[in-house]
């Protein structure tokens, strides 16, 4: 059940015997993809989002269980093959026909976690609200404006901005032709160039223990 505004998140319970640990978002996503649902996180953007707690969780002892949503991702590679993956924190998509990294061209961040590294990219989001926060930077946004926005990202004060669009969605689809292929990152892992992407938010797919 997704969290609603004003409700408490999580519950205190006895930690189960099938706990596994994840020190990064990619490792957390891999556990979920393998069908493991009870996870202790010790690093990554999701870990920071839930409070960066360093407490040791022991099976059979009392701990806090936090349900989270995950993102089921399907994308099409350059060779037209279709790949399905799980992501837990962030998805980054950037056209490959612009040079200059994030300083040039459009940029899309789909966030389930509040943070992307040191950046507070989704201050209004929650990892168990049944939605993702989609932030899209317009390709016409200048370098100086981007540098100014970056300086504000650490505090989440980069919004609102007329050239940065934000949406809260249950599903997200991005399609492009061969002339506008995108580079894709899932939870910090580079997936290569893609020509299509779809994301479905799945609620209560894992429980983080702290």
What are these model-predicted stretches?
Residues 65-67, 101-102, 126-129, 166-168, ...:
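A short, structural micro-pattern
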Residues 102-157:
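Internal helical hairpin/lid segments
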Residues 1-114:
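Catalytic core of DAGKc-family lipid kinases
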Residues 68-70, 131, 181-183:
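Exposed beta-strand and adjacent loop surfaces of beta-rich binding modules
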Residues 84-93, 106-119, 132-136, 174, ...:
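Short hydrophobic-aromatic micro-motifs
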Residues 136-210:
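ATP/nucleoside-binding phosphotransfer catalytic cores, i.e., glycine-rich phosphate-binding loops
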Residues 61-63, 98-101, 123-126, 163-164, ...:
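A general structural signal for short secondary-structure junctions and capping/turn motifs
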Residues 89-98, 116-122, 157-160, 184-186:
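Glycine-rich, charged/polar anion/phosphate-binding loops
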């Amino acid at each position: 059940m997704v969290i609603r505004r004003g409700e408490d998140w999580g519950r205190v319970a006895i930690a189960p015997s099938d706990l596994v640990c994840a020190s990064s978002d990619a490792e957390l996503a891999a556990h979920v993809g393998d069908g493991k649902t009870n996870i202790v996180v010790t690093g990554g953007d999701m870990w920071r989002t839930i409070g960066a707690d360093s407490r040791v969780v022991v099976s059979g002892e009392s701990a806090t269980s936090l349900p989270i949503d995950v993102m089921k991702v399907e994308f099409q590679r350059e060779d037209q093959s279709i790949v399905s993956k799980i992501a837990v924190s962030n998805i980054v998509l950037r056209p490959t026909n612009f040079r200059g990294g994030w300083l040039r061209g459009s940029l899309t961040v789909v966030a389930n976690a509040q943070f992307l590294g040191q950046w507070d990219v989704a201050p209004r989001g929650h990892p168990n609200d049944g939605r993702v926060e989609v932030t899209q930077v317009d390709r016409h946004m200048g370098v100086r404006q981007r540098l100014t926005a970056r300086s504000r990202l650490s505090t989440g004060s980069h919004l609102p901005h007329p050239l940065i669009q934000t949406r809260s969605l249950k599903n997200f689809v991005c399609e492009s032709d061969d002339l506008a292929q995108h580079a894709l990152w899932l939870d910090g892992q580079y997936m290569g160039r893609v020509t299509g992407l779809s994301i479905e938010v799945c609620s209560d797919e894992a429980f983080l223990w702290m």
